[in-house]
Amino acid sequence: MQPTKNIIFDLKKLSIIKVEGEDAHTFLQGQITNDISIATPTQSIHAGFCNPKGRLLAFFHIIKYLDSYLLICSASIAENITKKLSMYVLRSKVKVELNPKGIMYFGALIGNQDECISLEGKLPTTPMEVANQSSLTIIRLHGDIPRLLFIGEKNDCLNFIEKNCSQFEEKSFNDWSLQNIKSGIPSIYNETQEQFIPQSINLDIIGAINFKKGCYTGQEIVARTHYLGKPK
């Protein structure tokens, strides 16, 4: 991939799980490995979702989006994960929805700043930073070359692509995944569910585990591995 090019990526192999409601914050805090409080309108987070034995069911990129949280994960596990999360809702005032209607997302790599996309304000400059402009939510991802995730209403995304990205080179999801690998960002697919504890795929190194937060599903195993160096 030439770093001097601007590239747009097809991300159809990703899915979005939307979590919203009065108790959404508390609910997610009891399910994921990271502190959901860090996810704000200007900062996104990575997090794992474990089974009671501390094995990863999913790896999320979580974005605070309006009054909800968007959990981005592999499409191969999204339906199953939506069902599992819904099982934990019980009496909480929370709604869990897979691929909410009307929301669109796409990726871009800005290799040529001279032909950069036109926005009302500046692009996010540090990894995981979020900017909200031109009716879109824009997240900066890890990597030396600016790599961005765009989320918004479908019509806004399509208009933005037509206006700004018509000259971008189109690349597949495999190319997007390669950028994640180069940046040390893992993925969990259907074939790798329940195969790893979070530390085995470096979630601690990339800041996707908070060892000071309260309990969550699988937390005992994750903490024991951290403090004692091995799972039991």
Predicted regions and their residues:
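Basic, glycine/lysine-rich polyanion-binding surfaces/domains
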Residues: 1-232
